[in-house]
């Protein structure tokens, strides 16, 4: 069996990788309990920030975990031609509003704002969503961003 290693990704490689991905895993915590959920996202390298559109259906635990989490971890991983790549982003999640509130966040000069970027988050329907489902926009201001790519044999 061939031994493979991993190499760190630089900022440009991390940004390039995240631009080609649309789903990752958001890990949250409340006390001693953890909660991880696959979510669609968009990445703003200027922050850097990661934006999510989350569905808070009745009985969903995401809202309580977002509210309780002081520091979240978001992981994006994929098999590429070069081998496995992964990026880990960490930060304190914050609510940005509901999808209906987007117009209140637009830049006065009409330039692309974080709210516009949030619109680019794809909707993924995992369940038949009840009519009372509320979608919320969540921002993860990234204070730690790392990435690795699988390297060739030693």
Regions found by a protein language model. Name each.
Residues 1-19:
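Extreme N-terminal tail/first-helix region
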Residues 14, 59-62, 101-105:
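Amphipathic alpha-helical interface surfaces
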Residues 18, 65-66, 109:
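A generic structural signal for nonpolar/aromatic side chains embedded in well-ordered alpha-helices
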Residues 21-57, 74:
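Short beta-strand segments
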Residues 25-29, 77, 123-129:
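Short helix-to-loop capping/linker segments positioned immediately adjacent to catalytic or ligand/cofactor-binding
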Residues 55, 67-76, 85-94:
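Active-site-adjacent structural patch at catalytic or cofactor/ligand-binding sites
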Residues 55-59, 109-112:
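Short, solvent-exposed aromatic-acidic interface loops
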Residues 82-154:
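Charged, gly/pro-rich active-site loop segments
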């Amino acid at each position: 069996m061939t031994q493979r290693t991993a190499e760190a990704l630089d900022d440009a490689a991390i940004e390039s990788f995240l631009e080609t991905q649309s789903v990752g895993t958001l890990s949250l915590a409340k006390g001693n309990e953890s909660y991880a959920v696959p979510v669609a996202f968009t990445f703003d390298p200027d922050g850097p920030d990661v934006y999510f559109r989350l569905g808070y259906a009745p009985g969903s635990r995401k809202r309580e975990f977002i509210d309780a989490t002081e520091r979240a971890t978001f992981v994006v991983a994929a098999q590429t031609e070069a081998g496995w790549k992964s990026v880990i982003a960490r930060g304190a999640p914050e609510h940005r509003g509901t999808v209906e509130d987007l117009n209140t966040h637009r830049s006065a000069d009409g330039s692309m704002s974080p709210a516009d970027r949030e619109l680019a988050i794809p909707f993924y329907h995992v369940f038949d969503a009840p009519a009372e489902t509320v979608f919320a926009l969540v921002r993860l201001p990234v204070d730690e961003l790392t990435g690795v790519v699988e390297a060739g044999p030693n």
